[in-house]
Amino acid sequence: MKSAYITVVGNLPVSFDMEQTRKLGPVIASANANRSITYDYATVNTETNLQDMLNSANFRGTELLAPEKLFKKYVFFDGVNCLPEFPGLKSYDIDPEKCSPQTLALMLAVYLKQTMVFLVGYDISNPVELTRLKSIAIANPATKFMYICNPPRTYQLDDLENGFCDTFIKFQELIDNA
């Protein structure tokens, strides 16, 4: 049975047992920033990160998704696949080869059509990243986006109908009740 939930692990370090998030559904890593578990998927758009991930035990068994140009160079490596064509990429002004891996991970989560996306360690202090997150959320009203943070709670997503912020405590309760 397909899960309704997916977790996107951003670029920031996370002090949370990420293995627990698997109870909720698939987990997507943003490049090689957090190596705490074996992920279902990882997005990568630089050759250096991809090589590092291919040589890391934590990414064995992880589907590594890269933009087409990078994928073509690594087509014969196990686990390396091409990112899907994301609808509306040009309207978001997002270049898969130049944007952050966490933006790619967010796009992948939306593409996989889960109803709830949990954002853990996701960097919204960068105005470009926050704007892209909000644009993607607005363009996908059927998907809920829950930004997980430590107290105090941030209010940067409160202007979105389908985006909100909550604490790791609430996230842990969700996991425990899964």
Question: Could you tell me what each predicted segment is?
Answer:
Residues 1-178:
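Metal-ion/cofactor- or nucleotide/acyl-coenzyme-handling active-site neighborhoods
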